[in-house]
């Protein structure tokens, strides 16, 4: 089953588990949002909306909020010494489509559980592995004073004799 949704002035064809980068929408990372502007639903019996399907929505989980790439708008009018450089970065929300809903149904799938970080098991003896001493840093500190050793004063040039 697929759906065509409209968000941020753009249209997307989505299926469950799709990951999309769309214009910024409000919500915290990990929450489920419903996108209500569904233009078409496909599957066994395709349905088209005029312009949207009543009661249909797409549930999606917010994965991240970030900024898009830099876009630079440079305008130059030749031979007039006139130019303008402006730039911007769009705010982007990364979402994962969880399910496509019809008939005003509520989302049944909640946000995914976060993966736990693997914790290294401590040795059974209770001894922690020994860490190497930072020998390179100590050597670098000793080398710096030697390099800044005594410096001979600069000699001045002798004045030139005038010829008559």
From Swiss-Prot:
The keyword Ribonucleoprotein applies. One of its GO terms (molecular function) is rRNA binding. Residues 133-164 have a biased composition (Basic residues). Keywords: Ribonucleoprotein, Ribosomal protein, RNA-binding, rRNA-binding. Residues 105-164 are annotated as: Disordered. The keyword Ribosomal protein applies. It comes from the Bacteria. HAMAP family: Ribosomal_bL21. This protein binds to 23S rRNA in the presence of protein L20. This is Large ribosomal subunit protein bL21. It comes from Afipia carboxidovorans (strain ATCC 49405 / DSM 1227 / KCTC 32145 / OM5).
